[in-house]
Amino acid sequence: IADYILNKDDVILYEVDKNNKEKVEKAEKDPIIDMPIILLTNENTASSSEILAGALKDNRKAKIVGTKTYGKGVIQQLLTLPDGSGLKITSEEYLTPNRTKINKVGIEPDEEVKLPDSVKNVLKVEEKDDTQLQKAIEMAK
């Protein structure tokens, strides 16, 4: 998704291993989407969604509305042991283009807007009750 929005060669993320060796991932083509973008996030926004949010925010391609994201920014591998059991290890950590840690920290929104408690655990929130969506619409005008 980042390839469709970011400029060619914009940094999407850094992967850093335990020896602080960095790999950089950059956008590979020119964007095909060139319009204001407002991303909604909450505490359930995790992993690759956080990477996208961080990439768009740091490259000034989107504003983020909602609450802080979950904070899962690591690469994990499952090693199979001789007895058939497994061991999950963390091999690398993701950083945003500005080298901001994601893991156990999350991505902060540009505009913090909490959902009312009455709709927090509802699968489908009516538009009129969705304070985050209402703020995004207001910002888009």
Which residues fall in each region the model found?
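Beta-strand-rich C-terminal secretin pore/gate domain
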Residues: R60, G73, L81-P82, P109, ...
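C-terminal recognition in membrane/secretory proteostasis and scaffolding
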Residues: E15, D58, T80, K114-K141
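Short, well-structured beta-strand/strand-turn elements
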Residues: A46, N59-K72
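Conserved P-loop NTPase
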Residues: Q76-L79, L87-V119
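Envelope-exposed proteins and targeting segments
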Residues: I33-P36, R60, V74, S85, ...
